[in-house]
Every structure is written in structure tokens, then in C-alpha cells.
Amino acid sequence: MSRYVFTSESVTEGHPDKICDQVSDAVLDALLAQDPSSRVACETVVNTGLCMITGEVTSKAQVDFIHLVRNVIKEIGYSGARAGGFDANSCAVLVALDQQSPDIAQGVDEADDHEGDPLDRVGAGDQGIMFGYACNETPELMPLPISLAHRLAKRLAEVRHNGSLEYLLPDGKTQVSVVYENDKPVAIDTILISTQHTAEVAGISDEQGIRERITEDLWTHVVEPATADLALKPSREATKYLVNPTGKFVVGGPQGDAGLTGRKIIVDTYGGYARHGGGAFSGKDPTKVDRSAAYAARYVAKCLVASGLAERAEVQLSYAIGVAKPVSILVESFGTGKVSNAELTELVQEHFDLRPGAIIETFGLRNLPQQRGGRFYQDTAAYGHFGRNDLKAPWEDVAAKSEELVKAEAKRIKQGATV
């Protein structure tokens, strides 16, 4: 019997790097909402008293970027008396956005391999490799460690926003370690929560007293509600439970650490449980395959698991800049597939159109902000891009395609039996 512990982490929306992801995606939303054909590559950096957005934009949209940035920061919670050196109302906001390089644009606008099909005319915005993953550990077909870490981080933000724990401040991190036996989760080994807080907590000012109070409050208000519906639950007796291990966490956010777009790519995806191609998502329009093809790879992997063709599936896609068709497609089922990896790969090639133009069209990626009231991608930028029922993301809706795969496999088996 194999037994091991696997750990994943998440961060709250107030983490410096996540502030940057949300700002970059808010810029993307604002541009796409007005002009769905906008080309966007927006990077954000934050530090004490400063937020700068930079990158390349080609768009007909007219956006007040300074106002937009301040609103995102304020919504996260950095404003007023408890802003801590990073106040939405007074921080410096610098805008340094240029136009997209014409050398890149020509490859995206006119793919090298087009043959009359309009979808062949949209080339990949860059070369690269992307991975998608799904497994049957949770109802949303995500690995349990990252799923739990996101639940805790999101709940931590909720109790701050709703005032249940008034001493909480925006910055925070969670980490969950899960025990596996024969590749199945059997217990929650460790829960770690680090949360920024005020210097005084519920009238308590000594460090030990503050830590003890926060520890008890977070178990009651965060851990228990976040895990209440799970079959596998943590317990105070069996689960190691750590809160603010350094003792206190008063200085946080951009006052404590600089932040940058794209530095939480493992948090954004599968918590390290599956491979990652290295490309970040936030601030990139759908022609950037770092984002759109990663969404497609997740969709394919989830379809394979939802259809029962595999218990675990990892899908690798690769692209060349300016070329529409993927350079390669590979499926790995880790020995859990009902058919071989080669047969799964062949099934994917037959039933999924993974050209960038087709991915954009299938998921409606350019029009999502417009359809969702001017905001969509900003909400993907915290608490993960995958397994999110609250987002109603099109790459998570696999019911119809999974049924198509079931029928295709049944037909293949029937044809094989009659040969």
C-alpha cells in the first residue's frame, strides 16, 4: 500500500500578487466589455503606496484606468483607516500601456496554416505548452488539497467582508495537507492559515492571547463552515491545525511585500497536483493560448473524467506562434483509463477542436465580460480558475461533451466487436 501526504496552498484576494492578478483582469474585462476584439497583455505591480499597470493593449475601448484600479483595490478592502500603507484613495496609480507589437499581431490575425476556414485564420498568440487536469476526488473533479485550500481562503475573505471577525485584514494564505493511500484521499493531515489582523484583537493586545483568540475564531467561523458538506472532514483531535505560526501578522499586503501579476500560477490551477506549462492567465486576452488553451485543456480533461473514461486525466497541448493547429496533443491517465492513453488521445483529436479560434468561439471567451455585466475575468483571478461552480465558467460545463464521448466510445467498442 502506498501512503503519502500531498499539500496545496491558496491565498486570499488581498495577497499582493492576487491584487495584481485582479487589477490586470479588471483591465481586461473593461476593454473586452467595450471592444470584444481587444488585444490585451496587462501586467500589474504593487508596493507600498503604489500600483502600476503596464503592458500592451490594442483596443477601440475608452477606459479610465486610474479610476478602475482604485475601485478594484477598494473592493478588495484596502481603504480607510485600516488600509495599512496601501490605500485605494491615496496610492499612486501609474499607467504605462503601449500597443501590441505588429510582429505578434500579424501572426494572430493571419495564421500561417489557414486554408479558407475562418477558424484557421486565428493563430496562437505565442508558442508554449499548456496542461489541463481533472480527477474524481471532488464533485467538481479537482484535487482535494487545492479544493480545500480555496474553500478556506474564500471563507476567510467572506468573514472579513461580512464583519463576523472585524479584526481581520485583507492579506491571507491557507495551506492544506491531505493523506493519500493508494492514490485516494483518506484524511486531512494539516490545515495552516495565516491571516493579517489588527494590532489589537477583541480587546486583546498581547501576542499569545491574540494568536489563541484568532485560532479559535478561525476554526469556528472558517474551517467548520468551509468543510461542513465534505465526507472527509478535519477534526481538532486528528488534524494538525496551525494559525499564524510566526505569532502575529499585522503588517501585510503591499506594505509588507511587493506584488506582481502571474506569480501565483499554481494557486490558479491545480495546487501542484498536475504539471504546469509556466504561462500565467491574468491580464491576457483569449488569443493568448497561455490562458485560452489552458482552459481548453481543463475542459478536455474534465470531459474524460466526467464521461468515466478515466479516473484521472492530464492533457498537454502545445502551440507555435502564428499557427492555428496545436503542435501536439497528449493524454495521460496514470493507469486509470478504461482505454489506453493513445486511444484517449485519438478520441480527443477526433472530438475537440483545439485551434485558438475554435476555443474562443466554443467558450465565447471574447464576449464573457459583455454578457456578464462588464465583469468576468476579474472573478477568476482569485480562488482558482477551475472547479468554480460560482463562476459558471463555460470550460467547466462538460455535460454535453461528456455524453458525446460516452457514445463515441460505445460506438468504437461495438465496431470493434463486429470486426
From Swiss-Prot:
Flexible loop: annotated segments: 100-110
Domain of life per record: Bacteria
- Pfam families assigned: S-AdoMet_synt_C, S-AdoMet_synt_M, S-AdoMet_synt_N
| GO molecular function per UniProt | ATP binding; magnesium ion binding; methionine adenosyltransferase activity
Keyword annotations for this protein, in alphabetical order, are:
ATP-binding, Cytoplasm, Magnesium, Metal-binding, Nucleotide-binding, One-carbon metabolism, Potassium, Transferase
Q: Where does K(+) bind?
A: 43
Reactions catalysed according to its record: L-methionine + ATP + H2O = S-adenosyl-L-methionine + phosphate + diphosphate
EC assignment: the record states: 2.5.1.6
Function (record text): Catalyzes the formation of S-adenosylmethionine (AdoMet) from methionine and ATP. The overall synthetic reaction is composed of two sequential steps, AdoMet formation and the subsequent tripolyphosphate hydrolysis which occurs prior to release of AdoMet from the enzyme.
Q: Subunit structure of this entry?
A: Homotetramer; dimer of dimers.
| Name of the protein in its database record | S-adenosylmethionine synthase
Lineage, highest ranks first: Bacteria, Bacillati, Cyanobacteriota, Cyanophyceae, Synechococcales
